[in-house]
């Protein structure tokens, strides 16, 4: 993986600056109590759609093989393409407030990963990181995204982005990793050292989402109760798929060592920016 030289830093300035300023907003959506309608599900979806509109995004779908991908697209297709990959138990909407800063200068593509958001897969789907990276490549090809493209990944999305860039180095223009998952020599959190701890973060019953926020945010923001309930309900519904993803991460950690994981990414030659906050877990 290359380090950034001065010329490369200059060429990445717009992408890196916009992403760095915006990434702190991942997974946080500020809404007022007045926006919460009696019908929580309808209100929640309405708010998400309002955020997509505000970010300049349109909801689209694309069938590739046996997967019907749900994704957001914004910006002119004549601009450089930027692929944003969400994290574990997340969805494309985690990037809405980030995308707001990007759609003016980039062709932004944000898919729901298989088993997340509105991208539905079969019960026997292989949730391994290598397979997710391969399926993502098939999506990029079917969407006719002209490479090389910029790729940003958060959490699990960072692991997928790493493998994608390693397998398709000539199709990757730059790489931006936010709190990336993976198997590293200098892992500094319990979740990277031992993914079994991720099971503690599964949202499978009422009350779990509050625990998740406390564990994953240094200073959790105020979120109206109606929004919390709607988000928790969605995550409970997706708990079986999230459990399978966690199981695959645990299996990956047993199969690969830091050295063997590094081999998977040794062909990455794209300029890479890694962001990890002081309090991030």
List each model region and its residues.
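Flexible "cap/lid" loop of the alpha/beta hydrolase fold
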Residues: 162-167, 173-205
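Short beta-strand/loop motif that positions the catalytic acidic residue
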Residues: 267-268, 274-276, 280
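Alpha/beta-hydrolase fold catalytic core
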Residues: 2-81, 104-106, 147
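Alpha/beta-hydrolase-fold catalytic nucleophile elbow
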Residues: 112, 178-179, 215
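Conserved HGGG/HGGXW glycine-rich cap/lid loop of the alpha/beta-hydrolase fold
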Residues: 67, 72-118
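Gly/Ala-rich beta-loop-alpha elbow adjacent to hydrolase catalytic centers
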Residues: 153, 157, 161
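Active-site loop/oxyanion-hole signature of alpha/beta-hydrolase fold enzymes
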Residues: 55, 62-74, 110-152
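Conserved alpha/beta-hydrolase catalytic His-Asp/Glu region
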Residues: 186-192, 202-267
